[in-house]
Structures are given as C-alpha cells and as structure tokens.
C-alpha cells in the first residue's frame, strides 16, 4: 500500500471514530487540514460549513488533488470544528483584551456566518492575529495581520475585514489529530493543552523523550564560536538580540546535567566551545586570587553576583560529570569574587560597575542570593574550603531573618536542599519547607509555563525525602508530602503545554528552528535559552529522583 493510500485509510478511520464519540458532529461542522514541510509555516485548507458527510467528501477530494501524485508533507494535521457559536464581536474583543495572561484565548474564530473566513486557534497566534506588544501589555486583534493572513490563506479574493464594523463572529472548538509514523495521534480539545498530544501512560518515558529532544535543540543553539543563538519570537522568526552571561552559563550547566540521564558524547565539542566562550569573553581577573564575570554592552559593563555563581555552577558541574579538574582554578577565583560581595553579616551586594568595581545596585533580584549560596556549596563539596560553608551559613541567617521564603525562589530551594545535605539542622529544613508550603495555592493556579516552579518543587521534594530517610518524623509530617507530590505531577504535566511538539511548531514561521523547544506562550511565544535550561533541569530531576507512589 502506498504512503498516500495508508494516509487516506487512516484519515477515514479517524473520522469514523470521532463521529462515534461525538454526537454533536451530526450538526454543521468545518473540517480543516493543516499541511506543510518542516522549514515553512503550514498551509491550512478548510471545508465549507456543512454536514459531516459533505465536509468529508470535500476533504477527500482535496487530499486526492494535493497528495495522490506527490509525496505527503512532513506535517499533516486534521481538525474538526464543533460548538460553532455566534458571539457579539465586542464581547470577544473584550475577553481577549482582559485575559489574565496573554495568548490564552483558546478558540478558533469564523468572521462570517458561513465561516468562509475562519482561523484555527493555532493559526491565530502563529500569524499574530491576536498579539500583545509585550507580556505585560494586553492582547488585541491586529487588523493588518488579520487581512494579510486572509490574503495568504484563500485563493479567491475576500472582502477586507474592518474590525470596527464587525457585529458578530462565530467561535468554535476542535477535535484534532496529527499524522505521525503512519497513524493519527489524537490531540487535546480545549483548555491549556488544546491542540497538543497527551502525555503517554509511562510518564517518565515521555519526559525522558522530551529531555532528549530539548537537549538536542539547546545543543544546536551553540554556534561554532561557542556563543548561543539567544532566542526567537516564533510567530515571525524574529531573533531576540540581547545576550546574558548568567543565561549562557546556566544553559551550559543544564546541558551538562543531561548527562545524568543520557549519554551524548557528540555534545562535548560544542560544550567545550561554550565554556571557552564564557571564559574568554566574560571572565576577568581583578588580581591573582579574585575573578568576576562581566555582563552587558561595551561602555555599560557590570559585575553581577549571579553571573559569578552561574559560572561556578557550570564549571563545577563539568568537573562532576567528567571527573576532570581542568577549570578548578577558575572556579576558586570566581568564588573569591563572590566572597568579596558578601559582608561579615552574610548580606550580599548584587551589582558593581566594571572596570571601576564601585557599587551599582545593592539589590537587584532575589535569585542572585540563592544562586550564590548554591555555587559556594558546590565548590565546598569539591575543595572542602571551610570559608565557603561558613559564608553560606551567614547568608542563611539573613535569608531566615528577612523571611526570604516569601519569594518561593527555585535557587533558594536548590541551595537549601544542598545545605541540609551538609548541615542537617532543623532551622534550614524549616526554611526549605516554608519556601513552598506557603505557596501551594499560587502554584496550583499559576497558568503560565515558567519552568522554575517544577525546579523549586523537585529540590524541595529531594530535601523532604531525606527527612523521611533520616526518621525526622515531626518535620516530615509538616511537609505535606502527598500535596507536594500532587503539585509536582501537576506542574510536570502542565509544562508540556509550553513545548513545541510538531503539531504546534508547524504554525510558526520556521518550524525547523523551534521544533522541540520550550516556549513562553504569554510572552509572544518566546523561545529563549533560559526557557530550555529551566525546563531541562526540572524534568531531569523528575526522571532521576521522583518516586511518586512507588514503594
């Protein structure tokens, strides 16, 4: 049987199966077929708004014409639109404008009664028909983008859509399936996972596969000179032009972490290039014992506590994975740089000007403190320099006094887990518990895919597990382990909704450049290196350490 005949047969079977399960499809529906190569935004064909039999006939005629004599496209997806509902245009416009987070309107839209102009939810965002100027500016319908999308999509000319003159539109949900390995994979309908595949029953295997795919994506972002391609806004394949020392180093760190769950010797040349880039471009020695990592543009260079910490974490992880001490001298000088930014009470200074070394900002962002504490502890475990441990203990006195648990920060969770391995004192465990216990509701209701929440929860989980192993019953009972496990499962599942599976990537300008990347939906479908590293770290911890209900 030819590839085309297999595809045609599978499509018929899928449509029959959908009809059996969805009585509402007996009413008017629309069929959509999205198709395209790996390196271009997909095209989308649609049937008329009609009964299923008529729509199916139109679809089969189209696929005969499109694919019978030529190879199937790399990506093919079918959608059945249902719940076609007439709504006042102004109501939908306001709904989109007042969303709590951008780009979370999850319905398709038809712009006339017959839906002769209609777009799937994925098309609406892939073509920036709904967009925001930034993550903190409200969404709006872009009339120019809408009319350009209409012109691109339909062969026959369509009248110009003037948003101010619209009275009603028709919204709809879809049942969809993606054609992969000669079969159709069902995709979720509605809510946060709309239009993407379900997590397989073997969850760890599914996440392991995500790690493998995403680490390959992140590895591919390292250029020959060792610098990362920093990121893209996916809809129009626009590069994000900034760069950042902290994110460079922590992205290499996450790529090194992947060696804990997979063996990828082919990654080493680019990892070495990325480390070399960091040490030649950002590393500056103040004297023979002290070094700092610089960040920023020419004329605006600065020294960040977090950049020194990120570089130490990267180089210490390299030493842990390879058992080679090639970079230890750099790590020790960078640690001395951190010690210069911490006073005798454990209070930190976050940012200095470079090359003057004068104060720029005493405090910039909470995560520098936890990151610095973790970096010192990682080096302490390599060289046993007691100054490092004593400094972290002083820092923790400040964290506890200033009630830093209110920030539910992932780096604080990491460094607390690390410190309690070395100094298992109650006060440190209690701080670690409070870092997540007071934020259960916030985490449960968080409808964005920022990946640091899973990292924070997994570091806490490892710490709580040690309480259990050590028989510290009173503290363990305060940990609410069943609730913590539920939250971990929830976040691990939820964060897959920000992964560019092919069924989502195909609607963006260059699917091949963002396939298997993690993205931030509410910030213009942003793909940035730190979005990859945080997700990788969280999922690696889940695959390696999470036991769930296992005995």
Predicted regions located by residue number:
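Membrane-proximal envelope and lipid/glycan-remodeling enzymes
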Residues: 1, 34, 38, 312, ...
């Amino acid at each position: 049987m030819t590839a085309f005949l297999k595809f045609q047969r599978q499509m018929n079977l899928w449509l029959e199966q959908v009809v059996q399960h969805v009585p509402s499809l007996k009413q008017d529906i629309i069929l959509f077929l999205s198709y395209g190569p790996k390196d271009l935004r997909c095209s989308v064909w649609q049937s008329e708004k009609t009964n299923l039999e008529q729509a199916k006939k139109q679809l089969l005629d189209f696929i005969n014409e499109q694919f019978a004599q030529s190879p199937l496209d790399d990506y093919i997806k079918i959608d059945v639109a249902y719940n076609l509902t007439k709504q006042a245009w102004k109501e939908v416009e306001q709904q989109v404008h007042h969303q709590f987070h951008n780009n979370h309107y999850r319905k398709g839209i038809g712009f006339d009664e017959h839906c002769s102009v209609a777009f799937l939810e994925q098309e609406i965002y892939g073509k920036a028909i709904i967009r925001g100027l930034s993550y903190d500016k409200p969404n709006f319908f872009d009339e120019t983008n809408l009319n350009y999308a209409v012109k691109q999509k339909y062969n026959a000319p369509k009248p110009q859509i003037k948003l101010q003159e619209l009275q009603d539109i028709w919204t709809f949900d879809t049942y969809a399936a993606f054609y992969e390995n000669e079969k159709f994979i069902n995709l979720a309908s509605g809510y946060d996972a709309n239009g993407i595949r379900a997590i397989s029953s073997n969850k760890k295997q599914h996440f392991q596969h995500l790690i493998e795919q995403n680490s390959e994506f992140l590895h591919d972002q390292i250029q020959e000179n060792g610098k990362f391609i920093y990121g893209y806004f996916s809809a129009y394949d626009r590069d994000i032009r900034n760069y950042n020392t902290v994110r460079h180093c922590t992205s290499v760190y996450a790529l090194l972490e992947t060696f804990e769950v997979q063996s990828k010797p082919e990654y080493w040349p680019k990892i070495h290039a990325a480390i070399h880039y960091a040490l030649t471009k950002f590393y500056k020695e103040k004297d023979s014992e002290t070094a700092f990592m610089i960040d920023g543009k020419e004329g605006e260079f600065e020294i960040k506590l977090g950049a020194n910490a990120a570089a130490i974490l990267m180089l210490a992880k390299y030493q842990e994975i390879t058992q080679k001490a090639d970079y230890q001298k750099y790590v020790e000088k960078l640690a001395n740089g951190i010690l210069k930014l911490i006073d005798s009470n454990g209070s930190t200074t976050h940012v200095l000007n470079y090359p003057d070394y004068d104060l720029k900002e005493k405090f910039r962002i909470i995560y520098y403190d936890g990151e610095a504490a973790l970096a010192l502890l990682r080096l302490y475990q390599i060289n046993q320099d007691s100054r490092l441990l004593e400094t972290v203990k002083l820092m923790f006195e400040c964290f506890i006094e200033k009630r830093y648990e209110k920030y539910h920060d992932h780096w604080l969770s990491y460094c607390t887990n690390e410190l309690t391995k070395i100094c298992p004192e109650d006060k440190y465990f209690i701080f670690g518990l409070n870092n997540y216990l007071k934020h259960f509701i916030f985490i449960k209701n968080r409808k964005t895919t920022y990946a640091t929440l899973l990292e924070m929860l997994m570091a806490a989980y490892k710490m709580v597990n040690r309480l259990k192993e050590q028989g510290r019953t009173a503290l363990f009972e305060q940990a609410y382990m069943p609730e913590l496990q539920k939250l971990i499962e929830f976040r691990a599942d939820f964060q897959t909704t920000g992964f560019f599976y092919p069924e989502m990537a195909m609607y963006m300008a260059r699917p091949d450049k963002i396939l298997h990347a993690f993205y931030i939906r509410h910030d213009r479908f942003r793909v940035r290196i730190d979005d990859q590293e945080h997700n990788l770290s969280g999922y690696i911890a889940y695959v390696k350490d999470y036991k769930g209900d296992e005995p």
